[in-house]
A protein has these predicted regions:
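Amphipathic alpha-helical segments
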Residues: 26-33
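Hydrophobic transmembrane alpha-helices and their immediate loop junctions
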Residues: 2-13, 18-23, 36-56, 64-361
């Protein structure tokens, strides 16, 4: 990831890149001039030095400083012939706001839902596709339920996607729009790239959080009016948001758990992450949630295969507090949505019990 960029260092840009593994690379005018191997030292201090030719004279250039990952803070000094020409420090907020000066290669993912997402991104410039997909979603849900219920469910999905949009705007990102995908939910797009794992967590999890709020509102409306319409809306909206929290990319849960696991660099953290995944699978099967447990296994396998490549990511990892907070936030959302589904399954109504039956398939 890009740690530092000086736009004018002897008339050319000076860029420092590095990873949590310890390696660093220094580029002057996009040419590699110094590097530090991952195994070179565990010290937070860094020192890069290179020479430039100016006619018959030699210009000695140095970049020194201190780098701390948790919490992220880098202080630096740039020197030319032992004279300081630039100095300062950067924290996580600076990383969030930066625009990387090198193109970011898209991550390679193979997933059926991922292919749908890729197709959506390819069509995102066509405004007509929004109308087409919204109509297709309305027709699909009308076929399963009533026309009125389909409209209400789509409104819930829009509220879910609005949660993503609000999070993007919080980080100052421009949004492209919201697309509805029949039976899969929706997709909120942005023209800009994220720079930190925390941004990925917040943007991903705000959709299901807004979805939970909508289900709770419908639940309260059911208690007040006794209308089964609101009960059905609450439970099926909870089911859609719960599926979105599965650890399968590019679903919201996949992004959240990937950001947590990819931010861990200690053996203890890896063991705890693996233990939590195994515990989640065991709990799912013990509660009769066969489908949920199976998809949880598939998602964890996908993340495990990609885990070794985590140091090649341009995203700033979560600190220890961010990892714990994100995990508790995620588990709390899953438990809340499951609670809603179990509550309505306990009413004895056949239709309201359907989401729980689906999870136990």
């Amino acid at each position: 990831m890009e740690l530092l960029q000086l736009d004018d260092f002897l008339g050319k840009p000076l860029r420092l890149e590095g990873s949590l593994a310890g390696w660093q690379q220094l580029f002057w005018d996009n040419t590699l001039v110094s590097q530090k191997d991952a195994s070179a030292s565990d010290d937070n201090d860094f020192h890069h030095q290179f020479e430039l030719q100016n006619g018959e004279s030699i210009i000695e250039c140095k970049l020194t400083g201190n780098l701390s990952w948790q919490p992220f803070l880098i202080s630096y000094q740039a020197l030319v012939n032992n004279q300081v020409i630039a100095q300062g420090e950067r924290n996580e907020k600076d990383i969030e706001r930066q625009t990387p000066h090198t193109p970011i290669e898209p991550e390679k993912r193979f997933s059926l839902i991922g292919l749908v997402s890729l197709g959506m991104k390819a069509l995102k410039s066509a405004k007509l596709i929004k109308v087409v997909l919204a109509s297709a979603s309305l027709a699909a849900y009308s076929w399963l339920f009533s026309f009125q219920f389909a409209l209400a469910l789509i409104a819930c999905l829009m509220f879910h996607e609005y949660g993503h949009v609000r999070a993007m705007k919080y980080f100052g990102m421009k949004t492209k729009g919201i697309y509805l995908i029949p039976f899969l939910g929706g997709l909120a797009l942005s023209d800009e790239k994220i720079n930190t794992r925390w941004q990925d967590v917040v943007i991903s999890i705000m959709g299901p959080l807004f979805g939970l709020i909508m289900s709770l509102i419908c639940m309260v409306a059911y208690w007040i009016t006794g209308e089964m319409f609101f009960a059905g809306l609450a439970v099926f909206n909870a089911l859609l948001n719960l599926f979105n929290l599965l650890p399968i990319l590019p679903l919201d849960g996949g992004h959240v758990l990937k950001s947590i696991s990819f931010s861990m660099n200690s053996k203890l953290g890896i063991v705890l992450c693996a233990g939590a995944a195994i515990g989640g699978v065991i709990l799912s099967y013990s509660l009769g949630l066969t489908l949920f447990g199976f998809l949880l296994i598939m998602g964890c396998i996908e993340i495990i295969f990609e885990w070794k490549q985590r140091h090649h990511s341009h995203l700033l990892p979560l600190d220890r507090y961010g990892q714990i907070f994100s995990f508790v936030w995620y588990v709390g959302l899953v438990a809340s949505l499951m609670g809603i589904i179990w509550y309505f399954a306990g009413t004895g109504d056949t239709l309201l019990s359907l989401p729980l039956q689906i999870l136990g398939t």
